[in-house]
Amino acid sequence: MATATIALQVNGQQGGGSEPAAAAVVAAGDKWKPPQGTDSIKMENGQSTAAKLGLPPLTPEQQEALQKAKKYAMEQSIKSVLVKQTIAHQQQQLTNLQMAAVTMGFGDPLSPLQSMAAQRQRALAIMCRVYVGSIYYELGEDTIRQAFAPFGPIKSIDMSWDSVTMKHKGFAFVEYEVPEAAQLALEQMNSVMLGGRNIKVGRPSNIGQAQPIIDQLAEEARAFNRIYVASVHQDLSDDDIKSVFEAFGKIKSCTLARDPTTGKHKGYGFIEYEKAQSSQDAVSSMNLFDLGGQYLRVGKAVTPPMPLLTPATPGGLPPAAAVAAAAATAKITAQEAVAGAAVLGTLGTPGLVSPALTLAQPLGTLPQAVMAAQAPGVITGVTPARPPIPVTIPSVGVVNPILASPPTLGLLEPKKEREEEELFPESERPEMLSEQEHMSISGSSARHMVMQKLLRKQESTVMVLRNMVDPKDIDDDLEGEVTEECGKFGAVNRVIIYQEKQGEEEDAEIIVKIFVEFSIASETHKAIQALNGRWFAGRKVVAEVYDQERFDNSDLSA
């Protein structure tokens, strides 16, 4: 019987000679089979080959990038689907209301009461929205949210994006949970400088169709001496707020809106006085009052206290959207749990990071540079002045919950108690929050008592140097010079050189601020004492403490 020899190519090499090759001799009439353990690949000419064309394995970096891409794609897909479903749901509701307002072929028209309720609900939805224009192109949604959040909880921010330039078009719509928040934002944010520009805040263009209903709601609200209070500290209770505002008159009710899931208040509420003058005095005196490190936002209520007028909550999402969001969130959470376990095991492997969800930053890694977006103010330099602190060394009594183990915490507690005993004699130790929560306060001293209850703010470790250099004097050596000079007073975490333009004009003055972050507050005070009033290059330097909360929130404009 005739035989035939079949030479196979493996990894691009022709069999034969000294190169490794696979060959098989089979009878002419027999069916050839690949060796055991190999895969057969069908070629274009119909022939089979036993060679397995394997791709090179992915490197750890490539695997990590692939996981990031998958996670980011999932998040964007979920966000897109939810937005589309929400818009479709709202449009459907509006269509149903419009169709129900007229006589339909197979049904009855809405009753006058139902029609009025639908119109009011529509008016409330419009009252909750504000238009924000003249937004600097480098500012993103996070900056807008941070600027407008003090007035009340934000439901959504809609920024219009240019698909060609991939930048927003300079305007946005901010939707709050309650109309009073939008009204306060309209009154207090118009013409405020944000990112070097005076933003424009107004009502959406479609408010005209609902203006009669809005005027009617405002007229009904005047019958109640209610005020709206926002930016309330999370540690304050209804009774605390009531005791503060009782100084202006007798209060009929004081209620903070609460999250039904967590039971915590949402940072805003309503207070109703017995007299109209009391509400006017409270608004004029307490608006922008610093209570526990947060500036209260206080204004007149623009809607009557009727449960039927409560705006729709996010719980009105379509069931399909809610299910999709829950399933996707669970999947992402599971991925993060796996990534977190990997971080615990290696203490050096970066976790999966996405624009929306990030793992906790390991202790010992210097914080990211403060990229404040107050453009055209520009950060020209951020210099870490020392290497990262090893993970095994706790810094200033701060313990990262991801890396800390129970024995370590147990060892740190006695040390913390000893430090408190050394800092405060028994007669001078500050009262704890739990010891003060049952105190009774009222009248004009209530505000100070509540502030004392909340006064647990961390001392600032940031120093700002003003009037030190001109913009033209900034060079590559300035950061190093500042770091070296300030290093005489303590360990410098970082140095930020920030240029801030004082207007929108092209020739507007630019001032330079230099921010120096130390490891502890005592080093900051030592540096300020030494540098304040010192002359540098013919200029008298002004050294001051900078607010830690502003610095942590990337706000370098103060």
From Swiss-Prot:
Domain of life: Eukaryota
UniProt region (Inhibits homodimerization), positions on chain: 1-515
Subcellular location, record wording: Nucleus
Chain positions with N6-acetyllysine modification: 250, 453
Cross-link position per record: Glycyl lysine isopeptide (Lys-Gly) (interchain with G-Cter in SUMO2): 42, 79, 457
Subunit structure: Homodimer. Associates with the spliceosome. Found in a complex with RO60 and Y5 RNA. Found in a complex with FUBP1 and far upstream element (FUSE) DNA segment. Interacts directly with ERCC3. Interacts with CDK7 and GTF2H1. Interacts with SRSF11/P54. Interacts with ARGLU1; interaction may be involved in ARGLU1-mediated modulation of alternative splicing.
Entry protein name: Poly(U)-binding-splicing factor PUF60
Lineage: Eukaryota, Metazoa, Chordata, Craniata, Vertebrata
